[in-house]
Amino acid sequence: MDGKRNPNGYKDRLLSTRQKIIVVLVAIFLVFVGTIEVLDRLGVYSWEQLYIKFGVIDGVSKTDSNFTVYYINVDQGDCSIIVSGDDVMVIDVATISALNEVRSALKTLEVDKIDYLVLTHPHEDHIGCASTIINEYEVSNILMPKLSSINIPTTSTYEILINDIAKNNINVIQAKPDYNFMIGEAKVEIFAPLQQYEELNNMSIVMKITFGSTKFLFQGDAESEVEQALVESGVDLTADVLKLGHHGSNTSSTNKYLKAVQPKYAIVSCGPDNPYGHPSQKVLDRLNKLNVGVYSTAIHGDITITSDGKNITVLTEKTGWFIWIKIFILLIELNQILQF
C-alpha cells in the first residue's frame, strides 16, 4: 500500500450500489411479470384486470358489463357504439376514411345486427360510412332528423345513402322531441331537433340514454342556439357523461348549458392536430372550472365507459407499451426512494 486513498472510491461504491438497486428492480419486475403470468394461466388474476386497474385497455374490447358505451377513435369524425344487453345502437359512422376503424370495432364486438343506427345529421364526418354499414350489416332501424328544403344536402354521400336505405328497405324513424325507445334495459329519449334550421349542425339529434341511475348525453354537432333552446325548454339535461357538441368547438358547450348538464365527464371526438383547433381551449377552460374530467379520442384513443346502473367506469385505449411505461415509471420512483 502506498498510503494514498482512491479519490474515486466513494464514487465507485456509489455506482456499485446503484447497479445493485437496478439489478434488484429488474428482478422485482421479472418476478412481478412472472407472477401475473402464472396467476393469469390459473385464472386467478389476469393482465386484463391489471390493465383495468391502471384504467387502460387494448382498444375496443368486449366487456362483462350489461351496458357499455364505446367512443371510437375515428380521427376527425364521430362514431359511438352502445351495447345494452343483446341490443346494439350505433351513433354516427365517421368519414369514409375511417371505415377500417368502424369495421374493426364492430367485428371485435361481434356485432352482426345493429338495432338502431342513429345518424345525428348528414355531414360527411358523421355519415361517411353509413352506406357501407347498411349494406354490410343487418340494420333494423335508422334514426335521422327530418330535413326540409332549406337544409337538405346535395352531396353524393347523402344521395347514395338515401338510395341505399330504400334499396335495403330499412325502417326510418324521424327524430323528434318526446320520442322514446329502449335498447336493452336502457331508455333513450330524443330532445332535438326542435325545429327546422338552415344550419345543418343545428338539425343534430340530441338524445339522452339512461341506464339505471347513470345517464349519457349525445348532441351531434348541435350548437349554442340549440343548447339555449334546450335549457329554456326545461327538459332534464343532467348527465354523467356528455359527448361534447361539434367535436369540442367553441360553437357549442356554453357555460349555461354545461351547468344544466352537470357532467362528471366530457368526451371529445376529434383528430390530433386537426386544422379546426378542436377542442377549443375556451371550452376546456369552462370544463376545468366546473371540475369536469375530459377524455379525447385524439389523446386517449378509443374510450370505453361501462355502467352497472349506479357507477360508471372509464377505460382508455392502451398502446402496446403503455402499461409497461407505467410500470417502468413506478420502478424509477422506487429507485429514487431507495436512494434516499
PLM regions and their residue ranges:
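Non-globular, low-confidence helical/coil segments that flank catalytic cores
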Residues: 2-340
